[in-house]
A protein has these predicted regions:
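Hydrophobic alpha-helical transmembrane segments of integral membrane proteins
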Residues: 47, 72-73, 91
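N-terminal intrinsically disordered, low-complexity tails of helicases
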Residues: 1-57, 95
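Conserved nucleic-acid-binding Ia/Ib motif block in the N-terminal RecA-like helicase ATPase lobe
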Residues: 27-32, 39, 85-118
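Walker A/P-loop
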Residues: 57-77
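Pre-Walker A (Motif I) flank of P-loop NTPase domains
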Residues: 55-61, 86-90
Length: 118
């Protein structure tokens, strides 16, 4: 383990090189998906994490349950999928069956009405 690895629970803010993103900054399909999910705007964890993920940066998010973490990584995944490629382009791994079901339900809700498959 490197000395540069943050300790668990350490409050390490994201660098200021990326500005927060707003719902209006997303593609029309993603805005529609958010509306379908009942999200009138992005929550703070999404607004801060999505620009990093869209820039192919690795992000580790620690936030309370129900804070929007799942949407924070599903929305950039959906944005980056190339519909012209008929291959698996993303894989989400989670530690429990219960969490897998929750993530699957959210992915199904967000991809409903799109050409994306889960």
């Amino acid at each position: 383990m490197s000395d540069e690895t943050p300790n668990e629970g350490m409050d390490t803010p994201l660098a200021d090189s990326f500005s927060e993103i707003r719902l209006e900054d997303l593609s029309p399909d993603l805005r529609t998906a958010c509306e379908r999910a009942g999200w009138p705007s992005l929550v703070p964890v999404q607004a801060k994490a999505i620009p990093y993920l869209l820039s192919d940066r690795d992000v580790m998010i620690q936030s309370r349950t129900g804070s929007g973490k799942t949407g924070a990584y599903l929305l950039p995944i959906m944005q980056k999928i190339d519909l012209q490629k008929n291959v698996v382009q993303a894989l989400v791994l989670v530690p429990t069956r219960e969490l897998a079901l929750q993530v699957s339900q959210e992915a199904l809700m967000l991809t409903a009405g799109t050409q994306l498959r889960t």
